[in-house]
Amino acid sequence: MPGIETIKSSWADEVELDYGGLPPTTETIENGHKYVTEYKYNKDDKKTKVVRTYKITKQVVPKTVAKRRTWAKFGESKNDKPGPNSQTTMVSEDIIMQFINSKEDEKANDPLLDPSKNIAKCRICNGEHWSVNCPYKGTAMDTNLMEKKAAAAASAAVDAPKSGKYVPPFLKDSQKGGMGIRGRDDTAAIRISNLSESMTEADLEELVKKIGPQSKMYLARDKNTGLCKGFAYVHFKQRKDAAAAIEILNGHGYDHLILSVEWSKPQNT
């Protein structure tokens, strides 16, 4: 009678015979690593063995996080061990969130608040501030700037005929080296407005004396208070000096105010 041959089965068949189903999940910790072994069926209805390896690290967390980890589990996970369960929890990477105030976001997108696009520019030192707030106001730098502007305006008035444009008679006379029929040009008068109430004749003279010689000046004052009414008239001996004064002083900051300078209009207009 032939003997019965012993047929060796696979480890999966042996596990099925021993346990009558899937074996339980096991965990072992060695050399700072945690090994989790579990068994499950794949899509072909075959038993598979899955081994997950975790590296154990220690880190400092906020008190609220540490307290939350001590909470008791509930439901189907009531009997689970501390820490995440691979059956119900998927551990992903930490996501860092940054909360931004909406007002700060609006300010960041405001082009007017961009420091690289500063709209203020000083006429004296070319700094990023208004001319009225310039620390060099009234110093030698301010004086040199006014003198350069006066020379540039006078030079532009002399070079005007080269452009082919209309040349007033008074400029033609000045180019010829004379003042014309009259000894002076009475039309070289300007009106300076937006002056402060504390303005005096001495201040007015100090303001325009570096530009060119004047024939007369008039500072409008209130009859009752004697304070400046906010405007004044200055008559220069030459019209080119008056043009230079308009170019220099119009928009110039003086006594915390921005001056407005224009040609004086005749009284009959």
UniProtKB/Swiss-Prot annotation:
SMART domains: RRM. InterPro entries: eIF3_g, eIF3g_N, eIF3G_RRM, Nucleotide-bd_a/b_plait_sf, RBD_domain_sf, RRM_dom. Gene3D superfamilies: 3.30.70.330. Belongs to the eIF-3 subunit G family. Its main location: cytoplasm. Keywords: Cytoplasm, Initiation factor, Protein biosynthesis, RNA-binding. GO terms for molecular function: RNA binding; translation initiation factor activity. The keyword Oxidoreductase does not apply. One of its GO terms (cellular component) is eukaryotic 48S preinitiation complex. PANTHER family: EUKARYOTIC TRANSLATION INITIATION FACTOR 3 SUBUNIT G. Residues 188-266 form the RRM domain. Component of the eukaryotic translation initiation factor 3 (eIF-3) complex. The eIF-3 complex interacts with pix. GO terms for biological process: formation of cytoplasmic translation initiation complex. It holds the Pfam family eIF3g. This is Eukaryotic translation initiation factor 3 subunit G-1. Signal peptide: none annotated. Coiled coil: none annotated. It is found in: Cytoplasm. The gene is eIF3g1. It comes from Drosophila grimshawi (Hawaiian fruit fly). RNA-binding component of the eukaryotic translation initiation factor 3 (eIF-3) complex, which is involved in protein synthesis of a specialized repertoire of mRNAs and, together with other initiation factors, stimulates binding of mRNA and methionyl-tRNAi to the 40S ribosome. The eIF-3 complex specifically targets and initiates translation of a subset of mRNAs involved in cell proliferation. This subunit can bind 18S rRNA.
